[in-house]
A protein has these predicted regions:
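Short pre-active-site segment immediately N-terminal to redox-active cysteine/selenocysteine motifs
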Residues: 37-40, 86
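Typically the conserved alpha-helix immediately C-terminal to a functionally engaged Cys/Sec
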Residues: 45-58
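Short, well-structured hydrophobic secondary-structure segments
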Residues: 33-34, 43
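Non-catalytic, surface beta->alpha helical segment in thiol-disulfide oxidoreductase systems
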Residues: 86, 91-116
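Thiol-based oxidoreductase modules, predominantly thioredoxin-like and allied folds used
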Residues: 36, 59-75
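N-terminal leader/targeting and pre-domain segments
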Residues: 1-32
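The canonical Cys-X-X-Cys-His
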Residues: 41-44, 90
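Short Fe-S-cluster ligation motifs
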Residues: 70-87
């Protein structure tokens, strides 16, 4: 039977921020994990479900930027700066070294390895 994924339930496990807050986190935190996506994107839905399933294995907050939030005036420049041409976007900043992935097919192990 087809199991419907519930995007809103999955992203509830993340802390929602706007792009300016995400930029601040990437600049100032030793470890920052940012997920960028939207509910209407099937690839985002798949990635958010996978990422939410890892929250108990990740010892840091996952921040969520809704790419469909039209009140976020700086999201286009944020996406351009970090070369997030498609969603889902996944940004990990460790000691201000930034890695960006725009690939919903990342495995759980690949996601965890990015955080090590």
């Amino acid at each position: 039977m087809f199991e419907e994924d519930n995007y809103e339930e999955n992203v509830k496990l993340f802390e929602k921020v706007i792009s300016a807050q995400a930029e601040e986190l990437l600049s100032n935190e030793d470890l920052a994990v940012i997920y960028i996506g939207r509910a209407t994107c099937p690839f985002c839905r798949r990635f958010a479900k996978k990422l939410s399933g890892l929250t108990n294995k990740i010892s840091t907050t996952i921040y969520y930027v809704d790419s469909a939030d039209f009140s976020d005036n700086l999201i286009d420049s944020f996406r351009e700066k970090y070369n997030i041409v498609t969603v889902p976007g996944f940004i990990v900043s460790k000691n201000r070294e930034i890695e960006v992935r725009c690939d919903s097919s990342l495995s759980e192990d690949e996601i965890l390895n990015l955080l090590k």
